[in-house]
Amino acid sequence: MAGVVLVSISNPNFHSAAAQEMAAAKAPSADPDRTHIDEVLKGLNRGHSVGQVEVSPDGKRMAWLQSGKDGAEIRVAPLDDLAKSERVTAAAKADQHCHEGQMVWAPDAQALAFFSDCARPGEQADLYVARLDGSPAQRLSKLNGYVEQPAFSPDGRSVAFLYVEGATRSAGALAAMKPWSGVIGEDGVEIQRVALVTVPANGSAEDTTAPAGKTLNSLFSFATPANLHVYEFDWRPDSRGLAYVAADPPGENNWWVAKLYTQEMGGKPNAILAPAEVSGALHGLQIAVPRWSPDGKAIAFIGGLMSDQGSTGGDVWIVSAEGGQPVDLTPQRPTSAAWMEWAGNEHLYVSELAGGNCQLIRLHLEGDKASQDVTTTFGSPVFSIPGAVGDGRMELSLSSSADHSIFVFRASTFDHPAEVYEAKPGTVMSAGLEGVIQLTHQNDGVEPAWGKSVSLEWKSDGFHVQGWLMLPKDYDPAKRYPLIVEVHGGPAAAVVAHWGGGGGLSATAFSALGYFVLQPNPRGSYGQGEEFTQANRKDFGYGDLRDILVGVDTVLAKYPVDADRVGLTGWSYGGFMSMFAVTQTQRFKAAVAGAGISDWQSYYGENSIDQWMVPYFGASVYDDPAAYAKASAITFIKQAKTPTLVVVGDRDGECPAPQSFEFWHALRAEHVPTQLVVYPNEGHAFADPAHRRDVMVRAVEWFSRYLGAGS
């Protein structure tokens, strides 16, 4: 397609005669019809999407993002009658459509704060507050940069949010990196800080005297210093301070060594916890989701081995607000906590991944929570759903009323499109979606375009491993089918059942086109506890690959899969696994490696996030190069025989394009069928829908060529 750089070894003059014969023997079918693939991809996201959902603090109303032909809009309605919804917007006219979202309720439930670009369409989002008395929304800022995570102060007088002034890109390592220029690491570093806007009682908030392009109006201020990059924050209960996770710039690289800070408004930051310096199980790990206890004495957070900011999993920890030794509240629990919030001073509600289920539990604290004497007990799950849940803010986050009698969230599975649900702690609920109250029915009657899915479990090296198997659409047990193994990124992440697909490497698309698809959660994944997540340290490509291969054997033993037609794919860490596995085994007859890593030694000096590697490899590449060579596909490239398609974005900072070039070049030198496709102006997470579609089309064509088409 236009704009895509395609590098191929399809020139027959390049191959030796033997290599050409081998390639021909492995090609059981011609490329499939692209028109048919397009039709399948278009049908994957049928139904209406559900955006962010927020229940009001008094539990009487709900705000949500509703998709429409002109984008998403904010709707508000009584929780017991969502049909009576009204639009909340900064638009001056009813027919004006803006990009709006990230709404948050005021503590008194009488107003919503949200971001909107109505004042500068397509250019800049500003903060607005809309009172629910019918008066127009107030614009409270004149910003110039990237914004996210608004949060009202507990007293309702201010809204804080994360802000990158003068940003040229979204914050984080997933977005396309800026072209390298100037003094690297010093020039043009973009720093995310907590900004603060005062909410006026009435009247216009815009300061028309502010210089053009500046954010200095009478209501705006920065709460955190310019020498700290802030990732997450939480208000102190008295509204006079913050707790936040932050690190020295550059922010993309240093999240893995971030510290927990507290700060009085107008004061200086105080680092109360540095995982690199503490002793015990938290040493050298990562922290996320800081939550201040209602009495202000302690801060709870999630700590664990995490490979990516925003992909949170670990144990629930607590530390005194004055600092000191942290306490693990959930040691040896066989789950991965992802989000939590306090319910009084003695309880925490925790959203966690348990095997293939997302569930909400209540954690009871006994003793002095600001000391080492605190103990915990667990209640039965409020709900446990074999699917994806969340309120649209962060992974597994939920929206609750102030008294925590109601939790509202969206949920979907491989079989059910997203709807909004309600859970009430203390009520008797069964497992699955049947155990919660469905509030919306906008997708009633919508059926999946792909096959049935099942949760598989198996044993590998003493570990209990879970994964998802998608059957081909219109599955016939009398037929034999090809199998595609899709390995997730991370590695600290997990495949959770969810609706939709169609962009990038999509399991639902492969299933819709007639393939079995195995999505394993091998050691290193979330869902089985912190010991399981840490089980691949200094072992990339070995124990986790064994888990995957045992999963393949489990599928072969139970389903009519042709063992000679098994393919492998994945993105990020899954891209690494796709590169490495084909140097370790000949079981895969074709592979598609997306944004992978082929040489950990060269990667260490190329990427924008090298801080993540030391917790996994135990030392830097300069101190222990052998540990990095052991996990590198390039080390074993002479053993690679599998035809492999390689795809990557040219501005990927997490898994830079040179890693894909290096692997492609090595395969080409070894006369292994390969092709490299580079997508312009793309980072680690592709932004252009046309590029995401193109990746999927090429992957289907590659697998069809070497595995044969699905049913």
Please state what every model-predicted region is.
Residues 62, 109-113, 156-159, 242-243, ...:
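Hydrophobic beta-strand positions that form the internal "hydrophobic ladder"
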Residues 57-58, 107-108, 154-155, 237-238, ...:
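Residue-level detector of Asp-centered blade-edge/turn motifs that repeat once per structural unit
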Residues 27-50, 210-222:
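A short helix->beta-strand "capping" segment at the edge of beta-propeller domains
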Residues 47, 66-75, 92-100, 113-128, ...:
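A flexible loop/linker signature enriched in serine peptidases of the S9 family
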Residues 345, 390-711:
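Serine-hydrolase catalytic core recognition
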Residues 78-82, 131-135, 199-203, 264-268, ...:
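Short loop/turn segments that connect beta-strands within beta-propeller blades
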Residues 40-75:
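Beta-strand-rich domains and repeat architectures in extracellular enzymes and scaffolds
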